[in-house]
Regions:
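C-terminal flanking tails of non-heme Fe-dependent oxygenases
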Residues: 1-114
Length: 114
C-alpha cells in the first residue's frame, strides 16, 4: 500500500486499463491510497495493483512536492492468495505461493535493482 498525501499541486495521474492516463488530483487535505502488487496477490486480484505517475506541467514556474509513504509486509509474510478471495474469484489461485521477501527480490530483479 502506498499513501500519497500532501501534494503541493496537480499532476497525479492514474493508468487506466485502456492505457490512457486519468488525472487524479486531490485537495491538500486528501490522501490517495494506492494498492500494490502484494495486495493484489493476497486478494487473488480482487484489489487491483495500480500504476500512477506524477507530471509537472508547469515546470518553469512551479515546483511540485509530495510525501509518499510506502507500507510493506514483513519479509516472512505469506502472500498465498486468501482462501475466501480465491472462492470469490472462481475457485483457483491466480498467484503463486510465495513470501513477501521472495516477491520483492523477484520484482527488484525485474526492474534491474537487484
Amino acid at each position: 500500500i502506498t499513501l500519497l498525501c500532501g501534494a503541493t499541486g496537480p499532476g497525479l495521474e492514474l493508468l487506466q486499463t485502456d492505457g490512457s492516463w486519468l488525472a487524479g488530483d486531490t485537495l491538500p487535505e486528501q490522501i490517495v491510497v494506492d494498492t500494490g502488487d502484494m495486495l493484489q496477490a493476497l486478494t487473488n486480484g480482487i484489489f487491483k495493483s495500480t500504476t500512477h505517475r506524477v507530471v509537472n506541467f508547469d515546470r518553469a514556474s512551479t515546483r511540485r512536492f509530495a510525501l509518499p509513504f510506502f507500507m510493506h509486509p514483513r519479509p516472512t509474510f505469506d502472500l498465498t492468495p486468501l482462501p475466501r478471495c480465491v472462492e470469490r474469484t472462481g475457485g483457483r489461485p491466480k498467484f503463486p505461493v510465495q513470501t513477501a521477501q521472495r516477491y520483492l527480490q523477484q520484482r527488484l530483479q525485474e526492474i534491474g535493482l537487484a
